[in-house]
Amino acid sequence: MRTKTQKKSQEKTNLNLSGYNRMMKLITQTTDLEIALATLRNSDFVTIDTEFIRETTFWPQLCLIQLASPDTTVLIDPISQDIDLKPFFDLMVNKKIVKVFHAARQDIETIYHLGGVIPSPLFDTQIAGSICGFGDSISYDQIVQRCTGYQLDKSSRFTDWSFRPLSEKQLLYALADVTYLRDVYLLLKKQLEKNKRTHWMDDEIAVLLEPKTYDMPENEAWKKVKGKIKKPRELAVLQKIAAWRERKARQYNIPRRHIIKDECLIEIAIQQPKDEADLKRLRSLNKNWDKFSIAHTLIKAVHEGLEVDLATLPALPKHNPLNETSSAVIDLLKVLLKLVANENGIAPKIIATSNDLEKIANGCIKKNIPAMNGWRYEIFGQKAEQMLKGKIGFYLSNGKINTKQL
């Protein structure tokens, strides 16, 4: 059942939607953009969403920008030949205005690639929602429904946003992505402040504000490759060929997997082909993979990996099997984690991952473990330390597990 506040919020938003027909003009010229954005500069916050396509490209192609303040909505056509987006990018770095997104990473990546700026100050309603008890990675339509009671029409989600003209249905869909976001933001902001949890967002927001998040250095591309290697020399080769793939994907503006798949990189790192003939013998490589005639440059990258001084490599991750004691400790940590999560009304995996628990159980309590840092340490990590030292125990009362100081 919706509350009176939710009903009022929906009525207010539906009233705004009823006036969309006169507000759905798509801005295609710089002068109109400057006029429209001037009305947003006096706002405390602006909600933002973008529509883009990137199925066949490395870089996202920005197709539409949606903005809303408490009393204004703006639709921008970034594809127009008559528009300069500088006024928009200037707004993104205006320190007086909070930029509100839902699941901001891809939107910011698109903005950063095109304009070289990262919106700041920043508020992400997906992150805030996870802290306010809405679960991990809640979708936009779900959080709108839970906060306002309104069910969004998502049927236009996968339409071709690069095609012009955009339909009225597409524009209505696009505007809904920022108008309802206003109500969600205000509700979550109030709840965070009430529970004194605003600072809990700091670590996640810091990642979103870091340029490295959107422009990964070539020499770190290997960290994103899925697959296991066991030997230092394999790691050296993987580093070089993953960097090679990153360069080629950017050069040709196509997805990394269209250059070569992760499983192929792993096989090459292990087999270390010396020439193109060796390369053709690999089972994971499709015979028609080399459509850009770049096999010789891949072999060169392999040779570079074979010449790397192994002493300069980072340590390979260790996959030590858990002993009986460590497994038991992990079970106890899971019990503690569930208790803490229930007490704070948030999902357990937002506080600590299975990997965090395994490291803690093995005696690693370094601050670079997310669960042992920041607000997570305040509510869970500190108790985990005390439990490992025998200072916290569990007891059963009225069918419920509780903790007590020992």
Curated annotation (Swiss-Prot):
Enzyme Commission numbers on file: 3.1.13.5
Main location: cytoplasm
GO terms, biological process: tRNA 3'-end processing
Membrane-crossing residue ranges in chain numbering: none
Domain of life: Bacteria
Pfam family, one: DNA_pol_A_exo1
GO-annotated cellular components: cytoplasm
Localisation per UniProt entry: Cytoplasm
One GO molecular-function entry: ribonuclease D activity
Catalytic activity: Exonucleolytic cleavage that removes extra residues from the 3'-terminus of tRNA to produce 5'-mononucleotides
Ranges of residues in domain 3'-5' exonuclease: 26-193
Broad enzyme group: hydrolase
Domain named HRDC: residues: 231-312
Keyword tRNA processing: yes
Function noted in UniProt: Exonuclease involved in the 3' processing of various precursor tRNAs. Initiates hydrolysis at the 3'-terminus of an RNA molecule and releases 5'-mononucleotides.
NCBIfam families from the UniProt entry: rnd (TIGR01388)
Name used for this protein in its record: Ribonuclease D
Organism of origin: Bartonella henselae (strain ATCC 49882 / DSM 28221 / CCUG 30454 / Houston 1)
Organism phylogeny: Bacteria, Pseudomonadati, Pseudomonadota, Alphaproteobacteria, Hyphomicrobiales
